[in-house]
Amino acid sequence: MSTIKIEKKSQLVKEVFDSVASRYDTMNDIMSLGMHRLWKDRMVNSVHFTKNSKVLDVAGGTGDIAIRIVRKEPSAKVTVCDINQNMLSRGRDKAINSNQINFDWVCANAESLPFEDSEFDYCTIAFGIRNVSDRKKALNEAHRVLKPHGKFICLEFAPMHYQNEIFTKLYDLYSFKVIPKIGSIVAKDKSSYEYLVKSIREFPTQADFKMEIEEVGFKNVEFHNMSYGIVALHIGTK
């Protein structure tokens, strides 16, 4: 299996999400059997958002996390940031349909955020960190824009490592054969979903990603597995 070259990743990611934006939520439901909704609920419910807090949701184009945050804490001021304008447009439409009209929507790269130092109380990112070209830059930027004692909350798929050979083969079959086939049928785009599966396989283990978060300066970093380690929630404090 070939790896994704860093120098080509930004353009590839843009093309992938340009292609799947209109059917992104539908595909998430189909591929995860609806579980992505529960994972996102747990992510938001794991954090106590203080009143009038400023939250930056990175790679948050679909608005899923932002909408959940303001439902939990209506006074929160949420900025949704995504590198892909098509995803932001879809998220803005979804937010309006959910009667959430007070978000700020910013098209920007997670590796070069257009915000001041120490501007936000919380920085969230769900299923986005594996798509950045340079994780260290993105993590450094998250650390920079957070206030002292601010929280970094990251939800991401994890590479699966099972001792059970049969389960491993079934998981690989579903990931590399079934998911791209579903993408071909539902989203008319097989190659984009081949990329998404490959990006999960190339992501570091939960323990290794924890170390990456710590290396940029976050303290008290911990992670919690969900659904037997299919996804993991990492939380750190500036």
Curated annotation (Swiss-Prot):
GO terms for molecular function: 2-methoxy-6-polyprenyl-1,4-benzoquinol methyltransferase activity; demethylmenaquinone methyltransferase activity. GO terms for biological process: aerobic respiration; menaquinone biosynthetic process; methylation. This is Ubiquinone/menaquinone biosynthesis C-methyltransferase UbiE. PANTHER family: 2-METHOXY-6-POLYPRENYL-1,4-BENZOQUINOL METHYLASE, MITOCHONDRIAL, METHYLTRANSFERASE. Methyltransferase required for the conversion of demethylmenaquinol (DMKH2) to menaquinol (MKH2) and the conversion of 2-polyprenyl-6-methoxy-1,4-benzoquinol (DDMQH2) to 2-polyprenyl-3-methyl-6-methoxy-1,4-benzoquinol (DMQH2). It comes from Wolbachia sp. subsp. Drosophila simulans (strain wRi). S-adenosyl-L-methionine binds at residues 62, 82, 109-110. Belongs to the class I-like SAM-binding methyltransferase superfamily. MenG/UbiE family. PROSITE patterns: SAM_MT_UBIE, UBIE_1. It holds the Pfam family Ubie_methyltran. SUPFAM superfamilies: S-adenosyl-L-methionine-dependent methyltransferases (SSF53335). It catalyses: a 2-demethylmenaquinol + S-adenosyl-L-methionine = a menaquinol + S-adenosyl-L-homocysteine + H(+); a 2-methoxy-6-(all-trans-polyprenyl)benzene-1,4-diol + S-adenosyl-L-methionine = a 5-methoxy-2-methyl-3-(all-trans-polyprenyl)benzene-1,4-diol + S-adenosyl-L-homocysteine + H(+). Pathway: Quinol/quinone metabolism; menaquinone biosynthesis; menaquinol from 1,4-dihydroxy-2-naphthoate: step 2/2; Cofactor biosynthesis; ubiquinone biosynthesis. Its EC number is 2.1.1.163, 2.1.1.201. Keywords: Menaquinone biosynthesis, Methyltransferase, S-adenosyl-L-methionine, Transferase, Ubiquinone biosynthesis. InterPro entries: SAM-dependent_MTases_sf (IPR029063), UbiE/COQ5_MeTrFase (IPR004033), UbiE/COQ5_MeTrFase_CS (IPR023576).
